[in-house]
Amino acid sequence: MASVSATMISTSFMPRKPAVTSLKPIPNVGEALFGLKSANGGKVTCMASYKVKLITPDGPIEFDCPDNVYILDQAEEAGHDLPYSCRAGSCSSCAGKIAGGAVDQTDGNFLDDDQLEEGWVLTCVAYPQSDVTIETHKEAELVG
């Protein structure tokens, strides 16, 4: 007779608890508390928020701006009036000059490569990529 010297145990039939992938089950906790946003399906993504300082003719203003919101839109949301026209990066009404920091303005098409290198920015199509300082109301200087 043959003897069995080892016994194998399979655990594939044992149920596993799914990993937590959403903050929804936690009561009274919003995604904004953690700098997170939740898309449909419960997937959680991380978004950064940066300090934006705008130097206007009326004095400096500061606010926080998420990296997926245009600077002009967030400034208006914070109650500040800035010049604009097209809101599509196709004109120079919202032109400014970057004094420090970085933005992503790949959605715009008005500024050429030389102007971008010189620090010109269109706030209507600029996402902050770091804490940033921008001198606003510069359309006349840009086109003049």
From Swiss-Prot:
PROSITE patterns: 2FE2S_FER_1 (PS00197), 2FE2S_FER_2 (PS51085)
Cofactor mode of binding and number, as noted: Binds 1 [2Fe-2S] cluster.
GO annotation, cellular component aspect: chloroplast
Signal peptide: none
Transit peptide: 1-47
One GO BP annotation of this record: electron transport chain
Protein name as annotated: Ferredoxin, chloroplastic
Gene: AP1
